[in-house]
């Protein structure tokens, strides 16, 4: 935001370069630019390469910066579609109660509504076919009592669509029957997404960043409850 406010174009481009194209890592310390972070730190479907409890914070900060640039003429989401995928990927690995797997060393995370609203905004802007599925997800989360759009505050007022478009996919594209999170070799099987009648199983245990907490483990979902690993927060 500070860089975008600079009137001197040379200075503005210099500071924006640290986000857009310039890495500053020396001896393991520094900052990665968006192109490098997108290449190294995201799975092909947009999951941050750490357990789900770590996903929302770094992704939300990258998206906040991307939205500022989008509002100033930079087509960041068009150039880096992985950011859009990262905005809603937690839904893909969610149980029917809309909590996600607790693999690794964090508690059980949820889809960030701020990120989902950003995904809806950009999918609407670029008229992407994923938009109806994202709108369906927002409605499901509202009906489940996990989101009240009227209380989104200044962020909602300044950054979200004034109203959600009327669209319905009629399909559950975000909740496939089988999924694999590649970097963690985490596998899931899903039978329905109804919070009471849906069933789901998650199995994982490969060696990866932050997997010192669980070892080989399994999570089972049924009758509205997840049974299995819970490493805490």
Report each predicted region and the residues it spans:
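Extended polysaccharide-engagement surfaces of secreted carbohydrate-active enzymes
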Residues: 49-233
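Active-site lining segments of carbohydrate-active enzymes
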Residues: 1-53, 57, 63-66, 157-174
């Amino acid at each position: 935001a500070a860089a975008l406010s600079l009137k001197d174009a040379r200075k503005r481009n210099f500071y924006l370069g640290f986000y857009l194209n310039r890495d500053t890592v020396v001896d393991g310390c520094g900052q990665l630019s968006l192109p490098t972070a997108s290449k190294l730190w995201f799975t092909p479907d947009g999951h941050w390469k750490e357990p789900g409890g770590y996903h929302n914070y770094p992704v939300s900060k990258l998206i906040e910066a991307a939205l500022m640039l989008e509002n100033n003429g930079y087509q960041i989401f068009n150039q880096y579609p992985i950011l859009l995928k990262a905005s809603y990927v937690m839904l893909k690995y969610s149980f029917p109660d809309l909590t996600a797997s607790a693999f690794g060393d964090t508690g059980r995370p949820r889809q960030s509504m701020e990120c989902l609203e950003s995904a809806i905004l950009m999918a609407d802007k670029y008229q992407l076919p994923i938009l109806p599925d994202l709108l369906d997800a927002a409605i499901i989360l509202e009906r489940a009592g996990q989101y009240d759009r009227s209380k989104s505050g200044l962020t909602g007022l300044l950054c979200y669509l004034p109203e959600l478009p009327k669209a319905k996919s009629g399909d559950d594209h975000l909740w496939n029957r089988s999924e694999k999170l590649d970097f963690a070799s985490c596998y899931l099987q899903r039978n329905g997404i109804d919070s009471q009648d849906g069933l789901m199983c998650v199995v994982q245990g490969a060696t990866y960043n932050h997997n010192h907490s669980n070892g080989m483990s399994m999570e089972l979902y049924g009758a509205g409850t997840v049974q299995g690993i819970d490493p805490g927060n």
